[in-house]
Amino acid sequence: MEENMEEGQTQKGCFECCIKCLGGIPYASLIATILLYAGVALFCGCGHEALSGTVNILQTYFEMARTAGDTLDVFTMIDIFKYVIYGIAAAFFVYGILLMVEGFFTTGAIKDLYGDFKITTCGRCVSAWFIMLTYLFMLAWLGVTAFTSLPVYMYFNLWTICRNTTLVEGANLCLDLRQFGIVTIGEEKKICTVSENFLRMCESTELNMTFHLFIVALAGAGAAVIAMVHYLMVLSANWAYVKDACRMQKYEDIKSKEEQELHDIHSTRSKERLNAYT
C-alpha cells in the first residue's frame, strides 16, 4: 500500500515537472524559428543549386566562357552570390538560436513578475536590441526577395519562349542576354528558336529544374520575411510584458517601503505613548 502511494506521488511529481517545463517553452518564438530555418534552408539550398544550373546553361547553350584574369563577369558574380548564400545560412542559424534563447529568458522573466529586478531589466534591454536588429533583417530579406524575383522573371521569359515555339510553327523568337544585363552591350550573346542550341535547351530538363529551383528559393525568401515579421510581433509583445513587469516590481518595492515606513512610524508612536504613560 505504501509502495503504491509512493509510486503515485512519484508519477505526480514527474507529471507536474513536465507540465512546468512545457509551460516555460516560448512556443511563438519556436514557431518563428522553425519558419525561419525552413525559409533559409529553401533559399540557400535551392538558390545555390539554381545558380549552379545557371552556370551550366550559360556555358552549354549560350556558349559563354569565364573571362581570364580578375575581370568581373557574370560567372564571378555567381560565385560571389554563392559565398553570400553560405554566409546567410551560417548567420541566420546562429541568429535563430539567439532568438530562441532570448525567448526562454524573457518568458522566465515574464512568468516571475516578482523576481529579481535585474533579470527583467536585462530582458527588456535585450528585447529592445533584438527588435531593432530583427527589423533591419526584415528589410534585408525584403530586398533579397525582390532580388530573387529577377531570375524568376528571366527564366519565366525563357520558358515562355520555349513554350511558344512548340505552339506556333515557324516562329522565330530570340533571347538576347544584353537586355538582362548579363553581358555588356559590346558582346552579342543571342540565342534564337531556329538554332540547335535553343532546341536542345528547351528539350533538356536542366532549364525546367533551374526555373523551379529559383521559384522555391523565392518562396523560401518569402518565408524568411514572414518569420521576421513573426519575430517582430513576439519580441514587441515580450518587450511590453517585461516593461510591465519592471513597473510592477517598482510598484511593489515602493509599496513595501511605504508599508515599512508606516510600520516604523506606528512603532515609534507606540513607544512614545508607552514612555509617556510610564
UniProtKB/Swiss-Prot annotation:
UniProt cross-references to InterPro entries, sorted A to Z: Myelin_PLP, Myelin_PLP_CS
Subunit and partners: Interacts with OPRM1. Interacts with palmitoyltransferase ZDHHC17/HIP14; the interaction leads to palmitoylation of GPM6A.
A molecular-function term among this protein's GO annotations: calcium channel activity
Span of the signal peptide: none
Cysteine-cysteine disulfides: C174-C192
Source organism of this protein record: Homo sapiens (Human)
Extracellular side: 44-84, 149-213
Topology of this chain in the membrane: Multi-pass membrane protein
PTM section of the record: N-glycosylated.
Residues carrying a glycan: N164, N208
Family according to the record: Belongs to the myelin proteolipid protein family.
Residues passing through the membrane, by range: 23-43, 85-105, 128-148, 214-234
Record's function text: Involved in neuronal differentiation, including differentiation and migration of neuronal stem cells. Plays a role in neuronal plasticity and is involved in neurite and filopodia outgrowth, filopodia motility and probably synapse formation. GPM6A-induced filopodia formation involves mitogen-activated protein kinase (MAPK) and Src signaling pathways. May be involved in neuronal NGF-dependent Ca(2+) influx. May be involved in regulation of endocytosis and intracellular trafficking of G-protein-coupled receptors (GPCRs); enhances internalization and recycling of mu-type opioid receptor.
GO biological process: neural retina development; neuron migration; neuron projection development; neuron projection morphogenesis; positive regulation of filopodium assembly; regulation of synapse organization; response to bacterium; stem cell differentiation
Cytoplasmic side: 1-22, 106-127, 235-278
Protein name: Neuronal membrane glycoprotein M6-a
Keywords: Acetylation, Cell membrane, Cell projection, Disulfide bond, Glycoprotein, Lipoprotein, Membrane, Neurogenesis, Palmitate, Phosphoprotein, Synapse, Transmembrane, Transmembrane helix
Annotated positions of the Phosphoserine modification: S256
N-acetylmethionine sites (modified residues): M1
A Pfam family recorded for this sequence: Myelin_PLP
